[in-house]
């Protein structure tokens, strides 16, 4: 993205939203630093809020030398999550991890709430079995639907139960 595109995108986001996004970005990058690596999840109240968060988190990560990849799952959720699952090393990733490994990539997964019901959660089962041990990636799961995200991460019968910490700002929770 060029500086001009980024400036144009910033100009369209209301200032209070930018301030929230910038504060969030600072917190999430500190939270996701390689020594901790706890996956996180965030529910955004709007497309504008989501884009502001993505922009702010990307800037903060790049400033710390963390590569970032944004993947929009919404066009084909199952296929795209399966493709991500194939990239994961599972146990091998943990065994091969050493101080000389490259900086892990921050994966920002947009539209993760697509898996938030019984009819769409099948791809989350193989994903969890490999994702929980992966050390190549840092994780930020984004969604728009609070109930679906809670179903995914807070329901004890789901494969992603407690797999990512909730970091949605209080004023964005509904």
Regions found by a protein language model. Name each.
Residues 1-37:
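A short, basic N-terminal segment
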Residues 32-35, 63-65, 94-102, 129-136, ...:
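Conserved catalytic network of the ASCE P-loop NTPase/AAA+ motor domain
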Residues 34-55:
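Walker A/P-loop nucleotide-binding motif
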Residues 38-41, 59-77:
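Conserved catalytic segments around the Walker B and adjacent sensor/switch elements
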Residues 73-96:
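Short glycine-rich substrate-engagement loop in P-loop NTPases that contacts/grips substrate
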Residues 74, 95-120:
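Conserved P-loop NTPase "ATPase switch" module shared by AAA+ and STAND
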Residues 114-119, 127-156:
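Sensor-1/coupling segment of RecA-like P-loop NTPase cores
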Residues 167-174:
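Conserved small helical "lid"/interfacial subdomain of P-loop NTPases
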């Amino acid at each position: 993205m060029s500086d001009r595109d980024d400036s144009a995108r910033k100009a369209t986001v209301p200032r209070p939203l930018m301030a929230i996004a910038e504060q969030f970005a600072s917190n999430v990058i500190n939270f996701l630093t390689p020594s901790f690596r706890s996956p996180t999840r965030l529910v955004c109240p709007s497309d504008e809020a989501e884009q502001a968060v993505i922009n702010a988190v990307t800037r903060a990560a790049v400033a710390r030398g963390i590569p970032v990849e944004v993947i929009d799952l919404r066009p084909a959720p199952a296929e795209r999550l399966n493709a991500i699952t194939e990239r994961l090393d599972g146990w091998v990733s943990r065994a091969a991890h050493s101080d000389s490994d490259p900086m892990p990539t921050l994966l920002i997964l947009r539209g993760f709430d697509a898996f938030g019901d019984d009819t769409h959660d099948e791809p989350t089962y193989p994903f969890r079995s490999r994702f929980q041990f992966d050390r190549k990636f840092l994780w930020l799961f984004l969604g728009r639907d609070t109930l679906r995200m809670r179903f995914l991460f807070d329901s004890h019968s789901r494969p992603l139960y407690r797999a990512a910490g909730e970091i949605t700002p209080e004023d964005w929770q509904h």
